[in-house]
Structures are given as C-alpha cells and as structure tokens.
C-alpha cells in the first residue's frame, strides 16, 4: 500500500512524526550503507535508509521510503520523523542570547513537505529488493545519435537471484570496460549467476557482502577498490 503525505508545517519548536502501530511486534531493523542493522526499540531516535521493518510473527512489516531517515520505535508503534521546527545554529554558549528577541526568526523545516511511503509485509530477504523497486523507478534518457558511428552490438544484463541487488554499473575510470557492484543485503549466503552479454559468472556472496565485477567481453571479480 502506497502512502503519500503532503504536510504544511508552520509551527515552532515542535516535531511531527508519522505513527504506525504494529501488532505482535518484535525485532526492529533498518537499512544502512551496504547492510542491515538492528535498531533500538526503547524510544531512542535511530537512523535507517530505504527501509525500516518490524518483525511481526514470521514476517516483517516494512516501511519503504525515499524521503526521510530518522524515527524511533516504542510500545509497539513505529514513529517516522517528518519535520522538526527548531532554530538553526541556536547552540547555547554561556549566557549568549540564542536568537534575537526583537525580530522574527524562521525555524527549520517550515513550509510544504511531500513524503512517499510504501507499506509491505514480506520476508527479511525481500526487504532490500522491494526498497530498490520503490526507489528506483524506470526512466528514459533523451539521446540524439548523430549516425556517424557504427552501433555496438546490444547486450543484456541479468542477475539470476532476484535478492542480489545490482547497485552500480558504470564505465571504468582506469581501463576499457565496465564496473559492476552487487550486494547481498541478507544474513545468509547467496549465489547468483551474473550475465552481461555472452559472458556469465557464478558468484557466491557471504552475508551482507559486496562484490565488484569487471566486464570487458568477459567477467572478472575484482576487489572493492576498483573504480
């Protein structure tokens, strides 16, 4: 279920959160940079990226998002931080006045804000893929070929395991070919066949492992420092 929120915020010194009650709640997890982390469930503010999920029975109740990062979990309810109407740079230093009291001072996050969420019930192994599908919508590139060069042969890119994410595919900065970066954002090992054109490589990922491949007509595994 997709949830779109338009918020007009003109308050001061207030925080607005979206509350999502979860029945039979258990462990709370969230996406981090190239991984998944267990989050606090005692009311402390936490950070997560494209998904935050709460275990409920054998499944996870997941909130996929592309517009906010903070929140907390407390008493069976997930709270997602939306706006915070505080004063920018009002840090107390001895007896110095925090903000001038003879004029209007605008607060942070005031104005119109738009948020886009997707609520899903799924297995843990599906979280990263579903978050990518929600965040990375297909797009078109406006290209005007001049017709002065012969077109290269088309080739396709595929990953046999749908829970292995292709994070990056780019031209190499150092050699003639392409860099592919893939991640297994799950606690168990995974295996996948990576196909680029006519080249195929079987790759085994340990838990939360990132792999780098290089394509120059053939596929080669490299270390993460390759750009």
Describe these PLM feature segments.
Residues 1-227:
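Terminal accessory/anchoring regions of large secretory-pathway or extracellular enzymes
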């Amino acid at each position: 279920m997709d949830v779109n929120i338009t918020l007009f915020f003109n308050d001061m010194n207030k925080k607005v959160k979206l509350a999502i009650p979860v029945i039979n709640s258990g462990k709370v997890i969230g996406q981090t940079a190239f991984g998944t982390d267990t989050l606090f469930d005692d009311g402390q503010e936490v950070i997560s990226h494209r998904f935050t999920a709460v275990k409920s029975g054998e499944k996870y109740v997941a909130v996929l998002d592309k517009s906010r990062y903070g929140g907390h979990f407390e008493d069976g309810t997930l709270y997602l931080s939306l706006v915070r109407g505080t004063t920018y740079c009002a840090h107390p230093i001895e007896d110095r006045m925090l903000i001038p009291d003879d004029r209007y001072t605008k607060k942070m996050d005031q104005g119109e804000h738009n948020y886009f969420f997707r609520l899903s019930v799924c297995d843990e192994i599906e979280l990263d893929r579903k978050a990518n599908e929600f965040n990375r919508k297909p797009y078109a590139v406006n290209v005007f070929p001049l017709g002065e060069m012969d077109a290269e042969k088309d080739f396709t890119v595929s990953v046999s395991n749908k829970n292995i994410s292709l994070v990056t595919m780019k031209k190499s900065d150092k050699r003639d070919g392409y860099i592919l970066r893939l991640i297994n954002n799950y606690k168990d090992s995974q295996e996948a066949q990576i196909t680029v054109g006519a080249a195929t490589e079987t790759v085994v990922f340990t838990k939360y492992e990132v792999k780098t491949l290089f394509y120059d007509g053939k596929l080669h595994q490299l270390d993460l420092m390759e750009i």
